[in-house]
Each structure stands twice: as structure tokens, then as C-alpha cells.
Regions:
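Helix-loop-helix hairpins and the membrane-proximal interhelical loops
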Residues: 2-48, 138-184, 202, 212-213
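Membrane-spanning helices that line or support transport/gating and their immediate boundary helices
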Residues: 20, 24-32, 36, 40, ...
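Alpha-helical transmembrane segments of multi-pass membrane proteins, especially transporters
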Residues: 15, 35, 39, 43, ...
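Transmembrane alpha-helical segments and their short flanking loops
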Residues: 148, 152-171, 214, 238-332
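Membrane-interfacial helix-loop connectors
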Residues: 59-62, 68-96, 103-111, 119, ...
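Hydrophobic core segments of alpha-helical transmembrane domains in multi-pass membrane transport
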Residues: 11-23, 55-59, 117-126, 140-150, ...
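Signature of multi-pass transmembrane helix bundles
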Residues: 5, 82-90, 102-152, 168
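Interfacial loop-to-helix junctions that mark the boundaries of transmembrane helices
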Residues: 1-9, 102-111, 165-170, 218-221, ...
Length: 332
């Protein structure tokens, strides 16, 4: 019992390091180049493609789609962006957030101690605030990877729990069970990047034969889709008390993820086959972290590919769902 409690503490400790590292990285980047990023968001949204690419790039730098979505909502409230400009940026933010999963699948956490050392060194050695911001960002990256390493080392004994194995068996039998598990995980942690990292760590544990994953790709995908749905709650919370357009962009974010998750769940086997086609071959437990990262990127990329040409229709849809006060609802 005591050993199980210690293992749980290790998992939560690793998760805390991951979240703090992500937050430190995001804050350091915002302090260092935040004004330029905000200027980039305001200027580079002339057309939907530019907005998509800008959203993806800014999110990849900040390592937080929630931060970009909240920034977009603030710009809408301030009148710096129009709704038609903001929606593609949110689509791009969903793509940019997949960078973390791809980095973790490359196992670059082996550089974590060097990143931590260089980050602290820069913070101590640099006299100007910009150099210290770079140091804090590098340190945040190192802390992020250290958190993942701690979670991975804790997963092996944790997965010996009969209760957890029973839950994993339920997830494998029911995609809906996995979807709800992913939503609950992200609602609890408030970070889809953290829950995807946790999923990668859990899925990479080998089964009884030492070849297959304990979870499997078709069981991991619904959890991943749930993670993507859960992250829309942050935008909804940020839109509370804001103007009508802020609520509409939060609704567009939710529709983007919900519609994509519904289609992928309905076409689970073909989607899993596409992911395997785009991923390296080998023992399942050795390649599943990459498969999950690729599934994350494919899901958001394909959703953006479908919805980007329909930006106008999305804007009309959210305006119809959330009409201006004292105005009748628009017809779709």
C-alpha cells in the first residue's frame, strides 16, 4: 500500500515538473518576445492561411495552445482582431500544440540535464533581462523533459495495479470510455500537452510478451481525442465575461475539436491504419509514443485542412448559435 502511494506521488511529482516547466517556458517567452508575438498575431492574419500558420508558429514557440487562445480572445475583446481573422489562428494553435508530443517521441529528454544546467547558467551569468528570459526558457524546457522522465519511470510499477489494468481493459473494449477518460484527464490537469505526455508514457510500457504495448494504438487514440476535447474548456472559461465574439471563437474551438473527434471515433480503424502508415515500424511498445504523436498531429492537421476552407461557414455557424443581443438568430 505504501509503495503504491509512493509511486502515485512520483507520477504526480513528474506531472508537476512538466506543468511548471511548460509554464516557465511560456512566461519566459512572453516576457522576452511577447510584444513581438502579439504584434505578429495582430498583423499576420490577413487571410485564413496566414492566420493558421501564425497560430501554429506562435503556439509552437509558447508551447501552450491555451495561452494563444486566451491571447486571441483578449485581442477580440480589444478590437484588434475580427472574428473571421481569429478563427484560423485558433485552428493553427491546435496544430502548434502537437510539437511537444513530437519532441517527446524523439526521446530528446536525454538532453534534460544539459538544458537545466545551461538554463541556470544563463540566468546567473546574464545581466540583462532578455538573456535571463532565454535562460528561464531553456530551464523550462529541461524541467519539462525531466517531468516526463519521472513519469515514465513511475509508470512501470503503477501499471502493475490490478485496478488500473481493469480500467485499461475497459478502455480497450470501449472507445467511448477512453474518450471520457481523456476529457477528464485534461479537465483535471488543464493541459492537453501534459495528458498527451502521460498517455505516451503509459502506452510505451510493454505488455506480457515484451513486444506489444500495454494499451495499444486503437485504445490510445480515443484517449487522445478526449484530451483534445478537454482543452477547449480553457477557451470557454476565458470567454466568460467577455464580448460576444470572444464567446464565438471559444465555440469555434469546441466545434473544431468535437467534430473531428466524432469523425475519428466513427472511423477509428481507418484512422489508426493511417497513423501506422505514417509511423516507423518495429515492436509496438517501442514505436507507440511516435504513433501517438503522429496521431495528434494528423488529427489536428486534417481537422484544419477540412475547416480552413469553411472558415466563413464556421463564423456564420457560431454567429447563429450565439447571436448579438436584441437581434434575431441568423439563418445558417
Amino acid at each position: 500500500m505504501e509503495q503504491g502511494f509512493q509511486v502515485l506521488l512520483q507520477v504526480f511529482g513528474g506531472l508537476a515538473l512538466f506543468l511548471y516547466g511548460t509554464d516557465s517556458l511560456c512566461r519566459a517567452v512572453q516576457q522576452g518576445v511577447g510584444r513581438r508575438l502579439r504584434s505578429l498575431l495582430a498583423r499576420c492574419t490577413a487571410n485564413p492561411v496566414a492566420g493558421l500558420l501564425t497560430g501554429a508558429a506562435v503556439t509552437a514557440v509558447l508551447q501552450s495552445s491555451s495561452a494563444v487562445t486566451v491571447m486571441v480572445i483578449a485581442f477580440l475583446a480589444a478590437g484588434l482582431l475580427q472574428l473571421r481573422q481569429a478563427v484560423p489562428v485558433v485552428f493553427g494553435a491546435n496544430i502548434g500544440t502537437t510539437v511537444t508530443a513530437q519532441l517527446l517521441a524523439f526521446r530528446v529528454e536525454s538532453w534534460r540535464y544539459l538544458l537545466l544546467f545551461c538554463g541556470v547558467l544563463l540566468c546567473l551569468a546574464c545581466k540583462n533581462w532578455r538573456g535571463r528570459c532565454v535562460g528561464e526558457a531553456v530551464f523550462g524546457f529541461g524541467l519539462l523533459f525531466e517531468g516526463v522522465t519521472v513519469m515514465r519511470s513511475a509508470m512501470e510499477p503503477l501499471l502493475q495495479s490490478p485496478l488500473l489494468r481493469l480500467e485499461l481493459a475497459r478502455v480497450q473494449q470501449s472507445p467511448l470510455h477512453g474518450l471520457l477518460a481523456g476529457v477528464c484527464m485534461t479537465l483535471t490537469v488543464q493541459s492537453s500537452s501534459a495528458t498527451v505526455a502521460l498517455l505516451q508514457s503509459m502506452a510505451a510500457q510493454p505488455g506480457a510478451d515484451g513486444v506489444h504495448s500495454l494499451l495499444g494504438l486503437t485504445a490510445a487514440i480515443p484517449i487522445l481525442l478526449g484530451d483534445n476535447i478537454g482543452t477547449t474548456v480553457t477557451a470557454v472559461l476565458a470567454a466568460i465575461g467577455q464580448g460576444r465574439d470572444a464567446k464565438r471563437v471559444a465555440a469555434a474551438h469546441a466545434i473544431f475539436n468535437l467534430s473531428g473527434a466524432a469523425v475519428c471515433c466513427a472511423l477509428l480503424q481507418p484512422f489508426a491504419a493511417l497513423v501506422r502508415l505514417c509511423s516507423p515500424t518495429g515492436a509496438e511498445c517501442a514505436v507507440i509514443a511516435r504513433q501517438i504523436a503522429n496521431a495528434h498531429t494528423l488529427f489536428n492537421g486534417l481537422c484544419a485542412l477540412v475547416w480552413l476552407p469553411l472558415t466563413g461557414q464556421m463564423v456564420r455557424l457560431v454567429c447563429a448559435l450565439l447571436p448579438d443581443k436584441n437581434r434575431p438568430k441568423e439563418r445558417l
